Amino acid sequence: MIKAVKGTRDLLPPSTEVWNRVEQVARAIFRAYNYHEIRTPIFEETQLFSRGVGTETDIVTKEMYTFEDRDGSSLTLRPENTASVIRAYIEHRLDQRPGVQKLYYIGPMFRRERPQKGRYRQFFQIGAEAIGSESPVVDAEVIELVVEILKGVGLSGFKLLINSVGDHNCRPQYVEKLKAELKDKAAGMCGDCQRRAETNPLRVLDCKVEADQPIIDALPSIVDYLCEPCRAHFEAVKSYLTDRGIEYEVRPRMVRGLDYYMRTTFEVVHGALGAQNSVLGGGRYDGLAESLGSRVHAPGIGFSIGEDRLVMSVEGDQPASQLDLCIAPLGEAAVRHAAILARDFRRSGHSVELVEGKLKRAMELANKFGARYTLIIGDNEIAAGRYALKNMATGEQVELTRDEIAARLDAASN
């Protein structure tokens, strides 16, 4: 028997209904903040990610699905979507459009990670990018947007972590300090950290090996090395978050796993997810567009929510989907009549299931479907224009006209 590939899975009902609710909430909140959807290809030229994400990141060195196309070009299934969105921004000259470009996306990404709870090799992200402003007001609004989505889907008990990783003016001094500190300490760390201590010391801070954490926690804080513009920017972001009533915790060694981040970085964690407890991450990337060939300065900030992990956090709290109406026709004439009724009720926005066969079986299925009502139709009901409608929760059964049934369904749905 052929099964789903390791690290992938089939999403089945009723779980898919929770996914749909989460996405509907996110789309509604994106609309409220004037974000518009963008859809990019699921594969891109490999150099987009090696240049954009960073050659020393785990994503590029270990996790990308890369293949050679028939023309010899190297292509990669997208491991994240910010680089793709910026590529589209440059290619289609979105800088020519008025104002900050606010774009969101929902879709699958691909990384060859070790499958574990909430982490898959094909996973889904809900993300957004605000491109065209360096203002700390935009940073705070993007973080507020994240918080609104999490609250909107019913997630509570999460923690917002923030930091500033400086810019090209102040970060080099910090990197040199890190390199000096790691000169004697790296030998006691994992192989990746030993290599990165020389090639990209900042990536050492992103190490997830538990045994290395005490060494990392003792390393200098980047906050102490921020230049005055970066420090002022970070203080403004914190102030705007406080104005909005958004609680946060500063994590001075949080750098996130992508090389393009600059200044503000943030992450949301949730205890229900265990050791790998991150729900989302994001940050500012003011130099990414230029690194991908843009002739126009295009500062931006964005985030991506791990939808698989978010759904896992809220799935148990979501109400079960309920079928509005189950129709039980008794006889051939009733089946024909019921099909028309079912179509009309569906056009009015109600979920309807028509069940042929014996009444006992229809009632059993209505219970299994979680139907609010069951409509029983026979020859007598058709002739009289009144139908037996049974409330499946109370057991009450009444005879109503078609319009009265429609009114009752409307009332139950509101």
UniProtKB/Swiss-Prot annotation:
Annotated protein name in UniProt: Histidine--tRNA ligase
NCBIfam families: hisS
GO BP field: histidyl-tRNA aminoacylation
Taxonomic lineage from the root: Bacteria, Pseudomonadati, Acidobacteriota, Terriglobia, Bryobacterales
Gene: hisS
Swiss-Prot/TrEMBL keywords: Aminoacyl-tRNA synthetase, ATP-binding, Cytoplasm, Ligase, Nucleotide-binding, Protein biosynthesis
Assembly and interaction partners: Homodimer.
Reactions performed catalytically: tRNA(His) + L-histidine + ATP = L-histidyl-tRNA(His) + AMP + diphosphate + H(+)
HAMAP family: His_tRNA_synth (MF_00127)
Location relative to the cell: Cytoplasm
UniProt enzyme class: ligase
Coiled coil stretches, renumbered: none
Natural source organism: Solibacter usitatus (strain Ellin6076)
One Pfam short name: HGTP_anticodon
